[in-house]
A protein has these predicted regions:
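Solvent-exposed beta-strand/loop surfaces of large extracellular or lumenal domains
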Residues: 171-206, 225-231
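Short beta-strand or tight-loop elements
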Residues: 138-140, 159, 201
């Protein structure tokens, strides 16, 4: 619910001022924590979704009994399941908005579908094909319908299409260069019938649009290392690995026990970001993971990180008897389910 509320808030901020930084936050909240809160079959849920889970510690600490290592079928206070259903059903309201003057259609999230809007009196459809969040390519085809008077609007219509320049691309210029539109560089009398302007993280394409005009995009998706805010005590000195809008996490399922001992050689990663590479994983068709080369105390090791929704496809690790004497309850082995942040290696 907290992640969904963050998406609500970011959308309201977009209505006040169309700035890409708000859409970046909204996208991150929707694609990561919100989706990870529900299993793929929709039958089990997380009530809380912390960055790290230590099942053994949660079992022993009565204050953390509500933190579960696996999704639960239901809760006594079950506001989260219907909240997830509501936002998934209404995701189109987060992907597109129309400016108050009725002349601009904003694309905030790049997802496949058809957006319908009336722009300056003309019925417009934007037919979008996108491969995000795994790949940065796609296209949006303009379809013109009838105007406000009911007449055919096959003739060019003037309006603006504004496309968000995602922060994860690596700068507005790089993102804008990845977008091209029909009519921007035509020869003859129709030369540059569509013009571009970058403002507040959006690329505004304005001009005389024709039925069938196409906007193509192919955003680069480098693996990025993000430092946590040191004012959050538990996150000080930690980093997250992100590719596109997806935040990745490390699990004992792939990396063995004692995830808390993992260190990232931040200097090496900053010097050569290609060390963190993307590869397909075998546990589920289409799932994508990151191989992150961590610097151990003695030797380099390869650590695997998976997108936050991945635990929906996995069984919890085998249970172990707590070392508390005879009759102790069985609890899952010391096995954090999520570790979105890896500690940064620091010199003494």
């Amino acid at each position: 619910c907290a992640a969904i509320s963050l998406a609500f808030f970011a959308r309201r901020m977009l209505e006040l001022a169309p700035k890409a930084e708000y859409a970046d936050v909204m996208e991150s909240a929707l694609y990561n924590t919100t989706l990870a809160g529900m299993a793929l079959d929709g039958k089990s849920f997380f009530y809380v979704n912390p960055l790290e889970v230590n099942p053994y510690a949660c079992h022993k600490d009565s204050r953390l009994r509500h933190v579960k290592p696996v999704r639960q079928k239901w809760f006594g206070c079950a506001c989260c399941p219907p909240n997830v259903a509501r936002i998934v059903e209404s995701v189109q309201e987060y992907a597109y908005t129309v400016a108050e003057d009725g002349g601009t259609l904003f694309t905030h999230l790049y997802m496949g579908g058809v957006a319908k809007a009336e722009l300056n009196g003309t019925a417009v459809e934007l037919d979008v094909t996108a491969n995000l969040p795994w790949y940065g390519d796609g296209k949006a085809v303009v379809r013109l319908g009838n105007d406000a008077a009911g007449a055919s609007a096959q003739a060019p219509a003037r309006f603006t299409l504004a496309f968000r320049l995602p922060g994860w691309v690596g700068g507005e210029s790089a993102a804008a260069a990845a977008i091209t539109a029909t009519g921007e560089s035509e020869s003859g009398a129709d030369s540059s019938r569509v013009t571009r302007e970058i403002r507040d993280g959006y690329l505004y394409l304005t001009g005389e649009w024709r039925d069938g005009d196409t906007v193509t995009f192919d955003f680069p998706m480098p693996v990025r290392m993000l430092a946590a805010n040191p004012l959050v005590r538990e996150d000080a000195g930690k980093v997250a690995f992100v590719r596109g809008p997806i935040t990745f996490c490390a699990e004992e399922k792939d990396n063995g026990a004692n995830l808390h001992l993992m260190h990232a050689d931040t200097e090496a990663l900053l010097a050569d970001p290609s060390v963190a590479k993307v590869e397909e994983f075998d546990f589920h068709a289409g799932a994508t993971g990151i191989d992150e080369q961590g610097q151990g105390e003695v030797e380099d090791v390869t650590r695997r990180m998976v997108k936050l929704e991945v635990p929906a496809w996995r069984e919890p690790l085998p249970a172990a008897v707590a070392a508390a004497g005879e009759g102790a309850a069985e609890v899952p082995a010391f096995a954090p389910l999520y570790t979105a942040y890896a500690p940064v290696k620091r010199e003494p």
